[in-house]
Amino acid sequence: THSVPFISQETEIAMGKGADEQITRQYGIYQNKELQLYVNRIGQNLVSKLSDKIFPRYYFRIVDSSDINAFALPGGYVYVTLGLMAMVNSEAELAGVLGHEIGHIIFHHGAKQMVRSIGSQILALGGAIASPKNAGQWLTVSTAMFQQINMGYGREAEIESDEQGILNSMEAGYSPFGMSGFLKSLRRKEIMSGQAYHSFQASHPDTRDRIVKAGLLAGRMSDKEEDGNSYRNRYLHQLRGLKYKGQKNSGDKKRHEPMYIDIYEVQKGDTFQSIAEKEMGNRRKDLDITVMNGRKESSQPKPGELLKLVRKGKFKKDKFLHIKPNPIPDPK
């Protein structure tokens, strides 16, 4: 059911569509069709598990930004940045993040916040769909929406969306610990770098609260180990060759050295320090490897485990063809 005072479903969809155009201009869509389809498939699977979808269509997009961020717009638009994709360590974590953003949409957090801040302009538009005649007014609304998405929606709304994301991802067959795992590794990253994910700052008093609540809810829902149904390797295989760092948005004119994410299979006898030395030429990069892979500094990698590593330069696909054993002959 649609429940935002003074706003019709059509208006809410139009608000999202207007701001979507600005986001696409501001960041650009990451040009990797296979990865876009992969994220969209996970997102649409989550939407299919909702008891009430609220909106007829949902869109999931990776935007070309090195910021660590995910955000949603009214009407069914969900975005994750390249920076966030690089931080995520399993499909279950990504499902938790996408489910959280779907929560913002179905609870109308963005639209309600807009009504509180610029309700009079939205009311003046009524149900009018964007057209050249009222383009100026729509621009005001979509600009305000664009500015607000990065500010988060306050403690209650974030926890409500965390819960929705955990429930939704579990219904879609994922470990409910994905969300808390992602929040924990993000907190480690933020403590190191001071970078923040929307409404999730290391200095924010509610950060630990969110991690604890997400972990408790997941624990109540599942008696399995934390890494059950995480689909970590499946996610990491998709990530190989992902552009790393680079521009924050279209206004970022700095020259960025090309870097990408590679996937390394741990060998017998490897430690994080030895991998850092062997693969990156600097054993002090071991901390970077543990943080990026959501691991505690005190832990050690296990043989056969896959790890993300950052490499300089542009990604080159394997030169060798992977021939599958015993190919099935075509039916005559």
Stretches found by the model and what they are:
Residues H2-S8, K17, E21, R25, ...:
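Extracytoplasmic and endomembrane cell-envelope/extracellular-matrix remodeling and assembly machinery
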Residues A19, L98-G110, E160, Q164:
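Active-site His/Glu-centered metal-binding helix of metallohydrolases
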Residues Q31-L46, Y58-S65, S120-L123, F182-K189:
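Acidic helix-start/capping segments at beta-turn-to-alpha-helix junctions
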Residues L46, H104-I105, N168:
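Short alpha-helical functional segments enriched in proximate histidine and acidic residues
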Residues I62-G76:
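Catalytic zinc-binding patch centered on the HExxH motif and its immediate surroundings
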Residues Y79-G96, A111, M151-E156:
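Short pre-active-site segment immediately N-terminal to the catalytic Zn-binding motif
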Residues E91-A92, I102-I118, A130-S131:
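Catalytic Zn2+-binding segment of zinc metalloproteases
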Residues A124-I129:
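Structural signal for membrane-spanning alpha-helices in multi-pass inner-membrane proteins
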